[in-house]
Regions:
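Flexible, low-complexity segments enriched for small/polar residues
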Residues: 1-35, 44-276
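Helix N-cap / loop-to-helix initiation motif
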Residues: 38-39
Length: 276
């Protein structure tokens, strides 16, 4: 029963009432015992149940730092070609080669994920080093549970992570060459995979549907669209996208990408993005 409850609390909801105990936990415990303690079979029973897909369970828990950070990184589908050297004190228009550690596949992965491990730590989840053998309190400590993930410090750190998308994601500081390595999100490539990518309203809806599980109101969607458009007419965005697809130069791609930087930061900081 203990393991079945823990699985339920992790995948569905931290609080278990008497009805859930009888209808869900007991069958899970029976399956776990009868399957010779096979966790996969027990999880299948839970994840395929009608209860798991009950809409009352949607958006009922706060995302952990792992879900918040890596959920965004997965959607934006980071690519190595978008690493670049950023000179701290000057820009002369030249391109600079990345340090070897960022071109070697093994070391590249280390330095890339090292930055995001630091982000997790700032948000209250020191990945690989839980505070006790019980793990992190949000997964077991009644009655607060997942609310532990949010406080003034961790919320500020989440906002800092989201703000990286506005100014490019800092990856590594190269003190010797007075420069740093950053990652630039290739929004143009993401949008190309959308349905009807030349329509700004369709694009905004697809960003929202991919990143949020909460349905936004029309006023919120209008505000997000306005962040992208600024003072320009929606038809100009269509022209901008078509110009990029017809002639995908760096300048055309960059002009399209710039429209989505501030938008992404706002989208990731919405309160609706902190629940699932």
């Amino acid at each position: 029963y203990f393991i079945s409850r823990r699985l339920y609390q992790f995948f569905v909801y931290p609080e278990i009432d008497a009805i859930t105990e009888e209808k869900i936990i007991e069958p899970m415990a029976t399956k776990f015992r009868d399957s010779n303690f096979d966790l996969i079979e027990t999880l299948k029973l839970l994840l395929k149940s009608e209860h798991f897909f009950d809409s009352s369970n949607f958006n009922s828990m706060i995302k952990s730092p792992l879900e918040y950070v890596y959920g965004a990184l997965k959607f934006f589908n980071l690519h190595q070609e978008d690493f670049y050297m950023n000179l701290l004190n000057y820009k002369d228009g030249n391109s600079y080669e990345l340090p070897e550690k960022f071109t070697n596949p093994l070391s590249r992965e280390f330095y890339f994920y090292q930055k995001f491990i630091w982000d997790l730590e700032q948000q209250g989840c020191n990945f690989g080093d839980p505070p006790s053998v019980s793990g992190w309190p949000p997964y077991y400590q009644a009655p607060v549970y997942d609310l532990f993930w949010i406080n003034s410090k961790t919320l500020s750190s989440r906002a800092g992570f989201a703000n990286n998308f506005q100014w490019d994601l800092f990856i590594y500081n190269d003190w010797e060459n007075d420069s740093d390595v950053k990652y630039r999100v290739n929004y143009a490539k993401i949008i190309e995979g959308f349905d009807n990518p030349s329509d700004i309203y369709s694009v905004v809806n697809q960003f929202v549907n991919n990143l949020l599980t909460v349905e936004l109101g029309q006023e919120q969607l209008n505000d997000l669209t306005e962040i992208i458009l600024g003072s320009i007419d929606p038809t100009y965005y269509t022209e901008l996208y078509n110009r990029y697809t017809e002639n995908p130069t760096f300048e055309n791609k960059n002009e399209l990408n710039e429209r989505f930087r501030n938008f992404t930061t706002h989208l990731l900081t919405l309160s609706e993005n902190h629940v699932f």
